């Protein structure tokens, strides 16, 4: 089974967590694209979706799934999204696709976070994948200096502007032993919008595509 086939299996497995008549929170990325394809098969059974990125919005609209503004929605039963890394405590690094802020906002609203990944994303310690930090453009150099003080090596992601009009610093060489603490520390730096650690709001259910099928893990 190829990596993409494992992503597809995880994406389709998330369909069973979608409630009929509900509005579904939808993330961003290659694995989520498979979930969107799956969601389109039951588009007549749901009210619609809230999207975390322009890319996902366009894909869903093309498939005939109604997309709502989050401000007009009171309740999201589930949010389905991928991760760049996830540990056994359901802490994640996300934001490889630069949609981390909107992803974090939609995740905060949802009652349940369903994380869908292939088995290459499971790790013991977060940090091998660079940690994305969304930054107000004028604060880029200042924030980079503060991230160096925290032990990281920040690199400006050239040519990338987020859906919110901001820039991304990818922080390398962080060994993240306390994800919740680091998430707070980075978010307290003036000029940071948010960072790609999803530890305070981790996943509730993890669906992992493997060569042997989809494995399900639940937050302890």
From Swiss-Prot:
It comes from the Bacteria. InterPro entries: NagB/RpiA_transferase-like, Ribose5P_isomerase_typA_subgr, Ribose5P_isomerase_type_A. Keywords: Isomerase. SUPFAM superfamilies: D-ribose-5-phosphate isomerase (RpiA), lid domain (SSF75445), NagB/RpiA/CoA transferase-like (SSF100950). The keyword Isomerase applies. The active site is at residue 103. Its EC number is 5.3.1.6. Pathway: Carbohydrate degradation; pentose phosphate pathway; D-ribose 5-phosphate from D-ribulose 5-phosphate (non-oxidative stage): step 1/1. This is Ribose-5-phosphate isomerase A. CDD domains: RPI_A. GO terms for molecular function: ribose-5-phosphate isomerase activity. Coiled coil: none annotated. It comes from Shewanella putrefaciens (strain CN-32 / ATCC BAA-453). The lineage of its organism: Bacteria, Pseudomonadati, Pseudomonadota, Gammaproteobacteria, Alteromonadales. Substrate binds at residues 28-31, 81-84, 94-97, 121.
């Amino acid at each position: 089974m190829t990596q993409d086939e494992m992503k597809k299996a995880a994406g389709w497995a998330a369909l069973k967590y979608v409630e009929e008549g509900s509005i579904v929170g939808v993330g961003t990325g290659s694995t989520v694209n498979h979930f969107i394809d799956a969601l389109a098969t039951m588009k007549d059974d749901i009210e619609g979706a809230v999207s975390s990125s322009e890319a996902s919005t366009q894909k869903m609209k093309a498939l005939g799934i109604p997309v709502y503004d989050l401000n007009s929605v009171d309740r999201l039963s589930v949010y389905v999204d991928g991760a760049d890394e996830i540990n056994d405590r359901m802490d994640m690094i996300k934001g490889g696709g630069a949609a981390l802020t909107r992803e974090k906002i939609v995740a905060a609203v949802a009652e349940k976070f369903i994380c869908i990944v292939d088995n290459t994303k499971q790790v013991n310690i977060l940090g091998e994948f660079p940690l994305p930090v969304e930054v107000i453009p004028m604060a880029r150099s200042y924030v980079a200096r503060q991230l160096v003080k925290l032990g990281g090596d920040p690199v400006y992601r050239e040519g990338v502007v987020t859906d919110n009009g901001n820039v991304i610093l990818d922080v390398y060489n962080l060994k993240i032993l306390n994800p919740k603490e680091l998430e707070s520390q980075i978010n307290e730096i003036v000029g940071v919008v948010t960072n790609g650690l999803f530890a305070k709001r981790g996943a509730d259910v993890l669906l992992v595509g493997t060569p042997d099928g989809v494995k399900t893990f639940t937050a302890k």
